[in-house]
Amino acid sequence: MKLDVIKLDGGKAGDIELSEDLFGLEPRADILHRVVRWQRNNAQAGTHKVKTRSETSYSTKKIYRQKGTGGARHGDRNAPIFRKGGIYKGPTPRSHGHDLTKKFRKLGLRHALSAKAKAGELVVIENAEAEGKTAALAKQVANLGWKRALVIDGAAVNEGFARAAKNIEGLDILPSMGANVYDILKRDTLVLTKSAVEALEARLK
């Protein structure tokens, strides 16, 4: 498939042939869902913790004698039945991550790129270079109509562009190796540089 290549000032800079294997697939929601779930679960801290009966510090004294009171039998006030007592089978720190094969992760990335291409939310620019002035880049981004955009560059992100984009709300920048399904789907517009297209095609072929 062919797509126009533009400059940051909005001018045309030719066109580019995109691989059908990367940008021409029929997007599958089940594949995208599995990869996003894998990403988010691996990112989850899993630090939730409550105290069990052995960890609470209240009292270890038996609250009253075993027999003769007419009440139920009880030990100390650390029991889960009492206020300030320990929690029975509560959450403990653990990893929420699970495995997903490299082959499937690559497939998910191809489907994410294809989803953006099919939705008309894919833009290819000649390069992502700037002098480091936020105001100038913000004006260009506004003129291009990018409200929530992810810019993916080649192997390395241009320092001036990264510095200029740092304070622009809704604009994220990643090198080609940082391209991932969650960040691609999270933004309304996916912007690829020509070097990013080449790097992604080499990575996902």
UniProtKB/Swiss-Prot annotation:
Is-annotated flag, keyword Mitochondrion? Answer: no
The Gene Ontology CC terms held by the record are: ribonucleoprotein complex; ribosome
Q: What is this protein called?
A: Large ribosomal subunit protein uL4
How does the record describe its quaternary structure?
A: Part of the 50S ribosomal subunit.
Keywords attached to this entry: Ribonucleoprotein, Ribosomal protein, RNA-binding, rRNA-binding
Q: Which GO terms describe its molecular function?
A: rRNA binding; structural constituent of ribosome
Q: Which Pfam families match?
A: Ribosomal_L4 (PF00573)
Q: What does this protein do?
A: One of the primary rRNA binding proteins, this protein initially binds near the 5'-end of the 23S rRNA. It is important during the early stages of 50S assembly. It makes multiple contacts with different domains of the 23S rRNA in the assembled 50S subunit and ribosome. Forms part of the polypeptide exit tunnel.
Coiled-coil stretches, from where to where? none
Question: HAMAP family under this entry?
Answer: Ribosomal_uL4_B (MF_01328_B)
Q: Which domain of life is it from?
A: Bacteria
